[in-house]
C-alpha cells in the first residue's frame, strides 16, 4: 500500500499551518514523515486474513494435510521441492497460528500436535495418497534431509504421527482396491462376508465399480 505525502506552499496562512501541525504527529527521528502504525497494522491484519482464507481454500478438495519440518531448508531447496510435486498437491509456508485458525472446528483440527516449530504444509488433493507422498520422500532421500521429516498428517479425520506414516505410504491404490474387492465379490460367499467387513467407503466404491461392470457387459 502506498501512502502519498502532501506538501504545502509557504504561501499558506499561519492558521492553515497551525491546523496542519495539529493533524501531523511529530517524531524526533523523522519530522516530515510521520509513522503510520494504524495503516501498518491494518495491512498486517489483511495479510493474516488472506493466509487463513488461502488455507481454507486448499482444504476444500483436500484428502490429506501434512506438516513438514522445513527448518534449515534454503529458498532454492524449497523451490526445487515444489517443482518435484505433482499438480494434485500444494505446498505452502504459513504460521502455525494461522493454519490452526483455518482448521479449528473441522476434522483437520486433529493436526493440533503439529502446531509447533517451523512447518511447511502439504495439501494432498487426491485419494492416491502414496503417489502424492512419494515425491517428497524421494527428494528428502536425495538431498539427505533426514531432519526435514513429516511432523504429522491428518487423513479422514485421523492423526498420523511420523512413526505411523508407513500406513499412509503403503495404502493400496484405487485400482488395487477395485481389483481385490471385485475378485472377492466373484468368489465364494465366505470371501464376500470378509469383503463386507471392510470400511464402508471401500464397499461403496467397489459396488459402484461392480455395477458399472455389469452395465458395460449388458451394453456389449
Curated annotation (Swiss-Prot):
Its main location: plastid. Keywords: Chloroplast, Plastid, Ribonucleoprotein, Ribosomal protein, RNA-binding, rRNA-binding, Transit peptide. It is found in: Plastid, Chloroplast. Residues 1-41 form a transit peptide. It comes from the Eukaryota. One of its GO terms (cellular component) is plastid. CDD domains: Ribosomal_L10. GO terms for molecular function: rRNA binding. InterPro entries: Ribosomal_uL10, Ribosomal_uL10-like_sf, Ribosomal_uL10_bac, Ribosomal_uL10_bac_type. Pfam families: Ribosomal_L10. HAMAP family: Ribosomal_uL10 (MF_00362). This protein binds directly to 23S ribosomal RNA. Belongs to the universal ribosomal protein uL10 family. Part of the 50S ribosomal subunit. This is Large ribosomal subunit protein uL10c. It comes from Arabidopsis thaliana (Mouse-ear cress).
